[in-house]
């Protein structure tokens, strides 16, 4: 399942990127996130985060690793647990009078759970939409 959300905010791109590339800020903008902690690293490629989110009435833990970091422009992570693999890609574009963020989230259910994809897809869409709305509000406060 692949979701792309784009939003433009008045905040300067350097502040937007600094905020996004600290994945622990998900607790401030993603309504599904219960907590996110940095397990190892200092934010660069290879940094590991543990995210606990509430999804369909249950808490799920996903361990993420930063896979791409192009300072000021792109931040990408790969997350995994026993049931899914997730890829989050955040791209930042300076618009002169604001910043456009393109947020791409991809989820792949593992094993026999793949057959549940059509059932889970609407809930994941709501999850991504809620995250994008929360992200817009958080970035507008920068």
Model-assigned labels for residue ranges:
Residues 20, 30, 79, 116, ...:
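Short, flexible helix/strand-to-coil boundary loops that buttress conserved ligand/catalytic motifs
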Residues 9, 53, 105-107:
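Hydrophobic beta-strand positions in extracellular immunoglobulin-like domains
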Residues 78-130:
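Beta-strand/loop substructures that line and gate deep hydrophobic ligand-binding cavities in soluble
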């Amino acid at each position: 399942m692949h979701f792309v959300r784009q939003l433009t905010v008045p905040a300067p791109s350097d502040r937007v990127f600094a905020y996004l590339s600290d994945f622990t800020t998900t607790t401030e903008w993603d309504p599904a996130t219960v907590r996110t902690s940095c397990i190892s690293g200092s934010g660069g490629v290879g940094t590991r985060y543990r995210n606990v989110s509430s999804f369909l009435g249950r808490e799920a833990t996903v361990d993420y690793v930063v896979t791409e970091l192009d300072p000021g422009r792109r931040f990408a992570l790969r997350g995994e647990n026993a049931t899914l693999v997730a890829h989050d890609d955040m791209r930042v574009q300076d618009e002169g009078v604001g910043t456009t963020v393109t947020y791409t989230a991809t989820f792949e259910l593992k094993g026999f759970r793949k057959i549940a994809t059509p059932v889970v897809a609407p809930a994941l869409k709501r999850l991504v939409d809620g995250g994008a709305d929360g992200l817009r509000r958080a970035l507008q406060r920068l």
